[in-house]
Amino acid sequence: MALALVATPPPPPHRFLSVDAPRHRVTITLIASYDAENNGFNFDGYSRYLMWTVPQGWTVRVVCENRGPLRHSCAVVQGASSATPAFRGAEIPQPQVGLEAGHTARFTFRASRKGVYRLACLVSGHEEARMWDVLKIVRHGRPSVVDLRAR
C-alpha cells in the first residue's frame, strides 16, 4: 500500500491582517516557520507570495513570532538583500541575529512614503531562501493582503 502525502494549504492571508480604519492603523502578523512550506523559510505559510497593501500615512504595527527551530526576524526593507530598514523603527531589535524559537517581537512605523518594499527575514541566508513578502504603500485605498499565486 502506497502512502500519499498531501500538502495542507496555508490559511487565508486575511487572517494575519487587522485593520482599524477610523484610526488609520493596521496590524500585520508575521509567523516565521508557520509550517513546512519552503522548508520552514516562510511567513504565515507563504514564501514571497503575499502582498500587503497599506495606504500612505497609516500606522503599521508588525507582530513577528518565531515558531521555527531556527532564529528568524522581521524587517521592512527596500530592495533585495537590503539590511537597512526602509522606515524608522521598521525592524525588530537585532534583525540579523533574529528571534529565538518561541519568541515574539513587535515594531511600529508610519508608512510615510509610497513604494514597494519587502517584509523580510534578515538572518543571513533567509531572504535568499525566499523568506519575504511584498509590502506596497499606496497613495489611497484600503489595507489588504493577497496571495499572489491566486492572481
Predicted regions located by residue number:
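A mature extracytoplasmic/lumenal domain signature
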Residues: 32-34, 58, 64-68, 76-80, ...
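Sec-dependent N-terminal signal peptides
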Residues: 1-3
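Conserved functional micro-motifs across diverse proteins
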Residues: 9-18, 37
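Extracellular/periplasmic metallocenter environments
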Residues: 5-6, 11, 22-24, 95-151
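Ordered hydrophobic segments in well-structured contexts
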Residues: 29, 51, 61, 118-120, ...
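Histidine- and aromatic-enriched segments that form or immediately flank copper-ligand environments
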Residues: 67-101, 127-134
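N-terminal edge beta-strand
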Residues: 23-59
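Beta-strand cores of secreted/periplasmic/IMS beta-sandwich domains, seen most often
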Residues: 15-19, 48-76, 104-113, 117
